[in-house]
Amino acid sequence: MADDGTIPVEPRVLSIQSHVVHGYVGNRSAVFPMQLLGLEVDVLNTVHFSNHTGYKKFRGERMTSEQLENVVAGLEENDLLHYTHLLTGYVGNPALLRAITDTLRKLRRQNPSSLYVCDPVMGDDGKLYVPPELGTSIIVSLSMLIFSHPCAVDIYRDEVLPLADIITPNQFECELLSDMTLTSDADAIAACRKLHALGPRIVVVSSFTPPKEPHRLWLYASQAVGQGLSNTFKMEVPRLPAYYSGTGDLFAALLLSWLTRHPSNLKLALETVVATVQAVMRRTNDAQSANRTFVRTYERTTTSFTPSYWYVGELKLIQSRRDIEFPTAAHQPEGAAALVAAGVTVVFLTDDKDDVVRYTLSSPDVILS
């Protein structure tokens, strides 16, 4: 595919993740933006819920591995497995996760260059969505994403990542997969390098909060360049005073979309993704600031789960369609200044013999060149 913003080969994405009737998480958050950006998207839903689980109640059904295999068999029988991309988010159980790896192998028999973008959803904020000691029990979490078995970490690490081209873990998921604690740039580089060694050529840590600076939010991106080395940079993103389910799903879908247009320019793609997500979140925050809804969820302590209250708001995705189609980002003349004005900064990190050298570029023309 060309790297000039054109798409000479029609991309077709198979998106396997959650679905809700009301709201925007999982496929509901991912499919619309990909279609707006010119991608054909086929959808396979791992759950079908009334709403995301941040609400006080939800109902619905979960897909089994047998059901997924049956659907994929139907596609295969009709010679419909010609996909250029596979995108996965929330999966739900180890058997289903393994069935997805089998599906990817079938896709690559049809198209060996099929690109796999994996969001390895397992937890956030220092905890699994379901704690290991509860086995297959279910705890209501703020996120749509509920994981139900501790061995998921091993399956992702040993079976999924070797097949993935791009992964988008959050800080906690990156720590689980790399078996490291992230506290610094050096830690992030080392963790990304460990994940590169497992298979993915691009690792994007979609959120990182410095231990002593909880008000700051960073994104790390690393691209393997061979011989155990990688090019790494980070972006500081403004933290809004609200939590919106579905932003991670939106992020991964946008990254897939913009890397389709710019496969050789990770920095440009990510700048565009961040600008878009920020625009959607700001539009959502502005629209809902006068009508906030708080719901009861549960936070885990060292010995139990205690109730807490979070603001739950649905992304204004439809209202943000022009922000998605025509993002103010690096590829537009006014994009550099707008991104900097929004508070986004870019820092390039390089490593030489395990030493970290930081280059902070303050000029918009340099940052986004």
Segments from the language model and where they lie:
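Short glycine/threonine-rich catalytic loop with a Thr-x-Gly-x-Asp
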Residues: V237-L255
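Conserved phosphate/ATP/ADP-binding segment of small-molecule kinases
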Residues: P131-T232, L240, L259-K267, A275-T276
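Short Gly/Thr/Asp-enriched flexible loops that form oxyanion-binding sites at enzyme active sites
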Residues: A95-K106, H215-W218
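Short acidic, glycine-rich surface-loop motifs adjacent to enzyme active sites
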Residues: H82-N93, D119
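Glycine-rich, highly charged phosphate/nucleotide-binding loops
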Residues: G60-E76
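Charged C-terminal helix
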Residues: K267-S369
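Glycine-rich phosphate/adenosyl-contacting loop at the front of the ribokinase-like
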Residues: M1-M63, Y311, K316-A337, A342-T345, ...
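A short helix->loop->beta-strand "cap" motif at the edges of active sites that frequently abuts
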Residues: L107-Y116, L198-R201
